[in-house]
Amino acid sequence: TGDLGRINPATGDLILTGRAKDTIVLSNGENIEPQPIEDAIVSDSELVEQVMLSGQDGRSLIAICVLNPNALAEAGLMDKGIVKGIMKDYEMVNDPKCNEEDCEAACKRLVEASNEIRSNKKLLEQVKSGVKAATSGGAFRKWEQVNDVYVTLEPFAMANGLLTQSFKVKRDFVAKRYEDELP
């Protein structure tokens, strides 16, 4: 089926952990299953709403992080007034009923806002430290550590073609969308 899993030793249950086709192979030949790392980042970092790892044939992993605008405001990293406008666009893009024209306009505004937040060094450092904390501490091997992050406010959604109808990230589409912008 292409699914990856493990047996829970305590119960004997099969736990699905990811898909074989999602495997990232670094330039040093190490194979990395991104799902457990992505799950750790989203659960440990309040600022990150969604994440996808990239790094195929590269030297290290890069996390494409969709940030939560409300969490940014609560952390004092973004003005609450600006966040109100961003949240309207964020919710519009996440609405599967959003018409194509409105969704494209909302995505464009979110991309512009994303370009602005990338110049906020304090915000970037806080996101990087949160991602590094989530992937360090012995839970993951050395080559599974995320070395760089790319932040955006545009969510992975059905309306912008980055999520399937079953809410799975379309990894190829996300990688193509950000290939020119990733370090």
What are these language model-derived features?
Residues G2-F140, E144, P155-M158:
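AMP-binding/adenylate-forming catalytic core of the ANL superfamily
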Residues T135, A139, Y178-P183:
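A short N-terminal helical cap/helix-turn-helix that marks the beginning
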Residues G161:
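Short Cys/His-based metal-binding microdomains
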